Amino acid sequence: MAKEIKFSEEARRAMLRGVDKLADAVKVTLGPKGRNVVLEKKFGSPLITNDGVTIAKEIELEDPFENMGAKLVAEVASKTNDVAGDGTTTATVLAQAMIREGLKNVTAGANPMGIRKGIEKAVAVAVEELKAISKPIQGKESIAQVAAISAADEEVGQLIAEAMERVGNDGVITLEESKGFATELDVVEGMQFDRGYVSPYMITDTEKMEAVLENPYILITDKKVSSIQEILPILEQVVQQGRPLLIIAEDVEGEALATLVVNKLRGTFNAVAVKAPGFGDRRKAMLEDIAILTGGEVISEELGRELKSATIASLGRASKVVVTKENTTIVEGAGDSKRIKARINQIRAQLEETTSEFDREKLQERLAKLAGGVAVIKVGAATETELKERKLRIEDALNSTRAAVEEGIVAGGGTALMNVYSKVAAIEAEGDEATGVKIVLRAIEEPVRQIAQTAGLEGSIIVERLKTEKPGIGFNAATGEWVDMIEAGIVDPTKVTRSALQNAASVAAMFLTTEAVVADKPEENKGGNPGMPDMGGMM
């Protein structure tokens, strides 16, 4: 396919048009009075959202050069979302401001490489200063404030704060769609995995269709159990103790399953069998987690252990186990707290090393199950459209809160960026490098200016006053008042603000140093369908 090439000014101008189209669509959502954007969906109702990255990902422009510019800025939003989980609109606004300002100077004859150096220098100073003014997040109230600001909803803030309090900072908090109108929190304490009973004859509560075992022993193995002879010795020992038994195995079938069911129905003893969770190496790791949590051992031939040789000492224990058709929950495992802590640290180390998003998610889940539990926020709304929009907002709020716990908080509403203004302005630089610093200075005013504009105010007036106010004092666009932002609960996670600035600068520097752009030449459609050969054309 033939290619079309554009050079220097022409190339950058074409890409800038794409940058502006995307950024203008995204930036209207910024601030407490930000507007929504409606996205067409090929199937189902349209999606209404104010989430920057969701909007950016939807935009495809017809002109290939404009589209490349748009995609570059979409990359800023996407990268910020990956790192911090929020702040995508701020990142887009910063990137657009740096690109526009930089392009003016490049057009006027400045050297793009000098500008790039200046931008990098300024951003490094700004990031250091942001870290210096960052405050650690303390208590449930601070967490609720961060979440409420991100979701623009105080009720959501309280829910997330409660969820984090219940399952700890390492706990897993997931979002599900609720059947009703209300948004509520459901916490599963203990370890839960997605495997249910092998046979419905094992249930103890026919009304709830679940098997509840009080103070049971837990047999953990990675083998398939089909012969009753294999587990007979351990069954006899458990029966003597007069306590129920949970069997976690690759599978329980045939004669072994029939014997367990018959004895359960006769009331001789109570045993429930479930399949082991996960697959392959992940299954081995999860079985080991369960063993450590319950104080038992994994009986595996790989470790030279046979089921026949299992004793009561090899079994795990818990205060309660609830098994439904789909899930098994182990509450209060009797494992040694030191071993559990060591296992948690081991998983944390793996988390830091992994590069796979899927592995990270699975390790995070395992960590949560060992550390305390899983919280589920069930999102409710009146219509499907509102539900999708609300779910996206809560997801952002959740990411924002995690980022705040990790790196602390700074004043929100663009105030923190204005607070680092003087430090960046004090950088000593000359020539084009100084121009790069000025570009960053102009860009860090932009979020405040945009927040003021969406609130129907003159942005420049707010920006100029902010430069003279003492640090931490900012403009609350929701009420139109000047307040101490942190005291008023208007805060941003440091990680979100830092990532937005770094990613915007990175893409702006790449954009300004672009000298040629290559795109596919659109094929001309000659029109009309060609007839099939020897058939006199199409009918």
UniProtKB/Swiss-Prot annotation:
<comment type="function">
    <text>Together with its co-chaperonin GroES, plays an essential role in assisting protein folding. The GroEL-GroES system forms a nano-cage that allows encapsulation of the non-native substrate proteins and provides a physical environment optimized to promote and accelerate protein folding.</text>
</comment>
<dbReference type="InterPro" id="IPR027410">
    <property type="entry name" value="TCP-1-like_intermed_sf"/>
</dbReference>
<feature type="binding site">
    <location>
        <begin position="29"/>
        <end position="32"/>
    </location>
    <ligand>
        <name>ATP</name>
    </ligand>
</feature>
<dbReference type="GO" id="GO:0005737">
    <property type="term" value="C:cytoplasm"/>
</dbReference>
<comment type="similarity">
    <text>Belongs to the chaperonin (HSP60) family.</text>
</comment>
<dbReference type="InterPro" id="IPR027409">
    <property type="entry name" value="GroEL-like_apical_dom_sf"/>
</dbReference>
<feature type="binding site">
    <location>
        <begin position="476"/>
        <end position="478"/>
    </location>
    <ligand>
        <name>ATP</name>
    </ligand>
</feature>
<dbReference type="GO" id="GO:0016853">
    <property type="term" value="F:isomerase activity"/>
</dbReference>
<keyword id="KW-0143">Chaperone</keyword>
<protein>
    <recommendedName>
        <fullName>Chaperonin GroEL</fullName>
        <ecNumber>5.6.1.7</ecNumber>
    </recommendedName>
</protein>
<keyword id="KW-0413">Isomerase</keyword>
<dbReference type="GO" id="GO:0005524">
    <property type="term" value="F:ATP binding"/>
</dbReference>
<dbReference type="GO" id="GO:0140662">
    <property type="term" value="F:ATP-dependent protein folding chaperone"/>
</dbReference>
<dbReference type="InterPro" id="IPR002423">
    <property type="entry name" value="Cpn60/GroEL/TCP-1"/>
</dbReference>
<dbReference type="InterPro" id="IPR027413">
    <property type="entry name" value="GROEL-like_equatorial_sf"/>
</dbReference>
<dbReference type="InterPro" id="IPR001844">
    <property type="entry name" value="Cpn60/GroEL"/>
</dbReference>
<feature type="binding site">
    <location>
        <position position="492"/>
    </location>
    <ligand>
        <name>ATP</name>
    </ligand>
</feature>
<feature type="binding site">
    <location>
        <begin position="86"/>
        <end position="90"/>
    </location>
    <ligand>
        <name>ATP</name>
    </ligand>
</feature>
<dbReference type="GO" id="GO:0051082">
    <property type="term" value="F:unfolded protein binding"/>
</dbReference>
<keyword id="KW-0346">Stress response</keyword>
<dbReference type="Pfam" id="PF00118">
    <property type="entry name" value="Cpn60_TCP1"/>
</dbReference>
<dbReference type="GO" id="GO:0042026">
    <property type="term" value="P:protein refolding"/>
</dbReference>
<comment type="subunit">
    <text>Forms a cylinder of 14 subunits composed of two heptameric rings stacked back-to-back. Interacts with the co-chaperonin GroES.</text>
</comment>
<keyword id="KW-0067">ATP-binding</keyword>
<keyword id="KW-0963">Cytoplasm</keyword>
<feature type="binding site">
    <location>
        <position position="413"/>
    </location>
    <ligand>
        <name>ATP</name>
    </ligand>
</feature>
<keyword id="KW-0547">Nucleotide-binding</keyword>
<dbReference type="InterPro" id="IPR018370">
    <property type="entry name" value="Chaperonin_Cpn60_CS"/>
</dbReference>
